[in-house]
From Swiss-Prot:
Residues 109-130 are annotated as: Disordered. Belongs to the universal ribosomal protein uS9 family. InterPro entries: Ribosomal_Su5_D2-typ_SF, Ribosomal_uS9, Ribosomal_uS9_bac/plastid, Ribosomal_uS9_CS, Ribsml_uS5_D2-typ_fold_subgr. This is Small ribosomal subunit protein uS9.
Length: 130
């Protein structure tokens, strides 16, 4: 078998993840580090691996990720979307399974910008009646 690789791009908040799936034994590397070294807790790792678990391909692919920007939760969400999109490239039969579990939907929520005259996005100065 030749060098087959499936690529996917995921975004979440301000994080961008470039995911590459290669047929293999199931190892995952994030910025050349293992997930339990890169992420502080296991819940984030479980969230990131969901597309592989749902499609039952956890042991079929090696996952190589380059992720930049944002925090750990945003990065995990970006990786999750990238893995789901790469799985679609590998096998389009996964579309229905991933679509039902909302793995293919890009989460549009992002930080709201600060407005002038306010202390934050919505926090306003204290109101004085007199």
């Amino acid at each position: 078998m030749s060098n087959v690789e499936y690529k996917g791009l995921g975004r979440r908040k301000s994080s961008v993840a470039h995911v590459k799936l290669v047929p293999g034994t199931g190892k995952i590397l994030i910025n050349q580090r293992k997930p339990n070294e890169y992420f502080p807790n296991s819940l984030v790792i479980q969230d990131m691996e969901q597309p592989l678990v749902i499609t039952d391909t956890r042991k079929n692919f090696d996952v190589f990720v380059k992720v930049v920007g944002g925090g750990f939760t945003g990065q995990a969400g970006a990786i999750r979307l990238g893995i789901a999109r790469a799985l679609l490239v590998a096998n389009n039969d996964f579309r229905k399974t991933l679509k039902v579990s909302k793995m293919l939907t890009r989460d549009p929520r992002a930080k709201e910008r600060k407005k002038y005259g306010l202390y934050g996005a919505r926090r306003s100065p204290q109101f004085t009646k007199r």
